[in-house]
Regions:
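Cytochrome P450
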Residues: 2-17, 79-86, 149-160, 170-200, ...
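Conserved cytochrome P450 K-helix E-x-x-R motif and the immediately C-terminal K′/meander segment
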Residues: 51-73, 262, 266, 357-398, ...
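Conserved cytochrome P450 catalytic core segment spanning the I/J/K helices
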Residues: 146-147, 231, 255-326, 356, ...
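Conserved cytochrome P450 K-helix/beta-meander segment immediately N-terminal to the heme-binding cysteine loop
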Residues: 410-437
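Cytochrome P450 heme-thiolate "Cys pocket" and heme-binding signature region
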Residues: 122-124, 317, 435-465, 489-492
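Cytochrome P450 heme-binding "Cys pocket" and the immediately downstream C-terminal segment
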Residues: 337-339, 441, 458-496
Length: 508
């Protein structure tokens, strides 16, 4: 899932034209003296600010990564006030940096999300915690989420949610102008699906997101999720002193998080009461059978504020990864019917005859084209286009020594669109993951991160995506909206469609 959502927007990437990415690493040889930050090329502060604030750069930070490589090479530096950021956009250098990490890697030292927790006296969850607290939470949650068999435990729960999604897509067809099979703004529908799925896993309860009438508090939560990423991007782009003069983004961010915490608290308290009631007089194994994730947190006797902080942040993280990736996947499959046909055949063979069969999590994970489609979509549209690190010691990146406590941004969008790694990098070609052509560098596409800071919900997200794609393509042929122009991505802290994706879901 979105393991570093709050920090991706610190990716201050700039510059002009966007040609090829295959810039030389500029190695000067092993006997050359290491170079300092002062030797790293980069834009002047006025150019950077103009690109960011006057030319719409905040919504196209991912494109500015590509342009930065073209102008400066794989490493460049930009300054914003007292903050200096080093950008790294070559897979070999990203690997070099990540393999120098300590036991508790730190990300950006400034986070408006963590500041909200401090001001509201809320506990940090896995997304906002740092240091020993982050390590403790990571160790606690890893066995519950990272192991493949742990994610597979929730397959039955997710299967029910997926079937409700199929029913909702049928209901949403033909609303408004256009063909009778057209569903407008599929990302909005998949937002509801993402929240329903992660809530079922976390809380063991259904929220009604996929019903004909969505509960008002659920609608408020969904709106807050979309809004908080916009306000995060604006807040992190502004120096702290400017927040007092332009309070709007910070105020919206706090209101959004307050809504999300209130929503989560309501459901956590309800589940806690139900667990306590059910556990009276029952053996422990009966209570825990098929239990939701929050139940295990109760069993660990985690303090109530910490449970609430983690559930709130995991609800947020579980929405965007699934909703955006599923939207892009069906968008690309609708524009590449030959791939969709091949994938439908693969899924049908696994399902067996009849459209109501349910493949196991293990069976889905063994479908090569299905896995390749998900990987290719995440290469083209990584949920988090850039990641950040703050090294706790001096490190070497290529020819440069990066001092400790320097903000470093890893430009994942740029490396995943590098033609030296991926021929025809802007084309949707799942076959590239099935042995077609040379294999890319393993750090060229890192949609879930790497190492101790990798996405905690990766297994769950992959399972949810595979199950949703399998059932949707079993029931529907997905076709593009007639006459629609191509949809491009934009940065909203995470990568999202710049406008609504409308698709036709034609019964098979």
């Amino acid at each position: 899932m979105t393991q570093t959502l709050k920090l991706a927007s610190r990716v201050f990437h700039r510059v002009h034209r966007a040609p090829k990415l295959s810039a030389s690493l500029g190695s000067r040889g092993s006997d050359s003296a290491p170079r300092s930050l002062a030797d790293i090329p980069g834009p002047s502060t006025p150019v950077f600010l103009a690109e960011l604030f006057c030319k719409g750069g905040l919504s196209r930070l991912h494109e500015l990564q590509v342009q930065g490589v073209a102008r400066f090479g794989p490493v460049w530096l930009a300054s914003f006030g007292k903050v200096r950021t080093v950008y790294v956009a070559a897979p070999t250098l990203i690997e070099q940096l990540l393999r120098q990490e300590g036991p508790r890697p730190e990300r950006c030292s400034f986070s408006p999300w963590a500041e909200h927790r401090r001001r509201r006296q809320r506990a940090c969850g896995l997304l906002t915690a740092e240091g020993e607290e982050w390590q403790r939470l990571r160790s606690l949650l890893a066995p519950l989420l990272l192991r493949p068999q742990a994610a597979a435990r929730y397959a039955g729960t997710l299967d029910d949610v997926v079937h409700d999604l199929v029913r909702r897509l049928r209901r949403q067809r033909g609303r408004g102008a256009g063909p009778p099979a057209l569903v407008r703004d599929v990302a909005g529908e998949f937002y509801k699906f993402g929240l329903e799925g992660i809530a079922a896993v976390l809380l063991g309860s259904r929220l009604g997101c996929l019903e004909a009438e969505v509960p008002p508090d659920t609608e408020t939560f969904i709106r807050a999720v979309g809004s908080v990423f916009v306000s995060t991007l604006l807040t992190m782009a502004m120096p702290s002193w400017l927040h007092r003069l332009v309070p709007g983004p910070w105020g919206r961010l706090c209101r959004d998080w307050d809504h999300m915490f209130a929503f989560a608290q309501q459901h956590v308290e309800r589940r806690e009461a139900e667990v306590a009631l059910r556990s009276k007089g029952k053996p422990e194994e009966d209570v825990g059978s098929g239990a939701h994730l929050t139940y295990f947190l109760f069993q660990e006797e985690l303090p109530a504020p910490s449970i609430l902080g983690n559930v709130t942040e995991l609800l947020l993280a579980g929405v965007d990864t699934v909703s955006n990736t599923l939207s892009w996947a069906l968008y690309e499959l609708s524009r590449h019917p030959e791939v969709q046909t091949a994938l439908h055949s693969e899924i049908t063979a696994a399902l067996g005859p009849g459209s109501n069969a349910h493949p196991s999590a293990t069976a889905l994970s063994q479908l090569p084209l299905l896995k390749a489609v998900v990987k290719e979509v995440l290469r083209l549209y990584p949920v988090v286009p850039g990641n950040s690190r703050v090294p706790d010691k001096d490190i070497c990146v290529g020819d440069y020594i990066i001092p400790k406590n320097t903000l470093v941004t890893l430009c994942h969008y740029a490396t995943s669109r590098d033609p030296a790694q991926f021929p025809e990098p802007n084309s949707f070609r799942p076959a590239r993951w099935l042995g077609e052509g040379p294999a890319p560098h393993p750090f060229a596409s890192l949609p879930f991160g790497f190492g101790k800071r990798s996405c905690m919900g990766r297994r769950l997200a992959e399972l949810e995506l595979q199950m949703a794609l399998a059932q949707i393509l079993t029931h529907f042929e997905v076709q593009p909206e007639p006459g629609a122009a191509p949809v491009r991505p934009m940065t909203r802290t995470v990568l999202v469609p710049e406008r609504s994706i409308n698709l036709q879901f034609v019964d098979r």
